[in-house]
């Protein structure tokens, strides 16, 4: 597999998906987030490698111009399974968490960041590739838990079944993207050094799983999960498959007068900071 990597060797690096920019946010906010994330990476001393597929070419370290081109021209939303297809067909494609972890590991990136991961959708057999990729690839993934639109109980059980290790960063509860609380307890850690110790143990055991580091949305931007659930009940689903998540997130932005968008941007910024700190200290260890 040929990946055009623009990563400077020897420096800490964090991999980031393109789906969050192309399918998860309005264009203006997506570009602002990209610029802010790059600014954070410069301030904190790490490289941010935004990973995507441009006309069949896999790129690790996309530029703002390339990201804008992807938004303008359109891009498929792909998990690990679809990568060879879009590459062979020369298409544009935005990577999900699963594809980003898979491609990151192929070029030596150990730390990946996102907003929220996929999981099990309610009411039907719809399980995200994010879960299966995390169950077979060793990496550190910083997120704010699973997306609030998912079946929380089923996803939590699937994470256990797939033996995916997870820890709460300064929290005792599994966060749900816009919401800090779920009622499900997780092992709590207080600092990045604890992340590194756990990850080192995983390496020693040759445990090929992704360590989920759960970083809750900042308290001032939180939207309680019961409020999100009430709103979701009012939405009539008009799409299926990979279009479900972007559709629901867009509807929630409209129904909350932009509160979910502000929460999304805030948690993504904090997750980039934490992932960068982990990558920097991992490189030194």
Curated annotation (Swiss-Prot):
Amino acids binding substrate: 77, 97, 128-130
Keyword Hydrolase: yes
Cofactor notes: Binds 1 Mn(2+) ion per subunit.
Residues that, per the record, bind Mn(2+): 126
Catalytic temperature dependence: No activity can be observed at or below 50 degrees Celsius.
Cofactors required: Mn(2+)
Quaternary context: Homotrimer.
PANTHER family for this protein: CARBOHYDRATE KINASE PFKB DOMAIN-CONTAINING PROTEIN (PTHR42909:SF1), ZGC:136858 (PTHR42909)
Protein's UniProt name: Pseudouridine-5'-phosphate glycosidase
Species of origin: Thermotoga maritima (strain ATCC 43589 / DSM 3109 / JCM 10099 / NBRC 100826 / MSB8)
